[in-house]
Amino acid sequence: MAEKQTAKRNRREEILQSLALMLESSDGSQRITTAKLAASVGVSEAALYRHFPSKTRMFDSLIEFIEDSLITRINLILKDEKDTSARLRLIVLLILGFGERNPGLTRILTGHALMFEQDRLQGRINQLFERIEAQLRQVLREKRMREGEGYATDETLLASQLLAFCEGMLSRFVRSEFKYRPTDDFDARWPLVAAQLQ
């Protein structure tokens, strides 16, 4: 029985990995059908549906992975790092690095892969970005408590500016067909971004 569950879990992971790879390839800029996905995995469409009730559920699973990966790591940064500037830099670098290491998932983050899918999926991505923005805002607000002085500019504006930078770099990565990596020249870009944090 345990072997059957493991085999089923492995097949589910294989399906999700194939979907992510298809999103990374030129197929990712078009609608991905279950027929194409089944062919990529080497199974029938019926076999896909034994593991996932719908393609939407497959995307849900990928979004769950994105959420878990980013939020868990952001929480680790907040636990381990106390300096506000370092926290912000590490969170931004985390988001950009995650996108760079997972190009197919970056198409989901930017919404490109979800254009042909249910609106609910885009809503989940919107919620994820709202959670990240809220965490950035909290880090910015905590500066006053941690370091004795805050920012002259409203923390809501600063948090949205940081997130807009991340979203812009991820969109550029997707638009360039993954040519312009989000972390390229990060050490030169970060001082420009950090200068806005006044």
UniProtKB/Swiss-Prot annotation:
Pfam families in the record? SlmA-like_C, TetR_N
Q: Name one GO cellular component term.
A: cytoplasm
Subunit description: Homodimer. Interacts with FtsZ.
Q: What is this protein called?
A: Nucleoid occlusion factor SlmA
Q: Which UniProt keywords apply?
A: Cell cycle, Cell division, Coiled coil, Cytoplasm, DNA-binding
User: Is Cytoplasm a UniProt keyword of this protein?
Assistant: yes
Task: Mention one GO molecular function.
Answer: transcription cis-regulatory region binding
HAMAP family per the UniProt record, alphabetical: NO_factor_SlmA
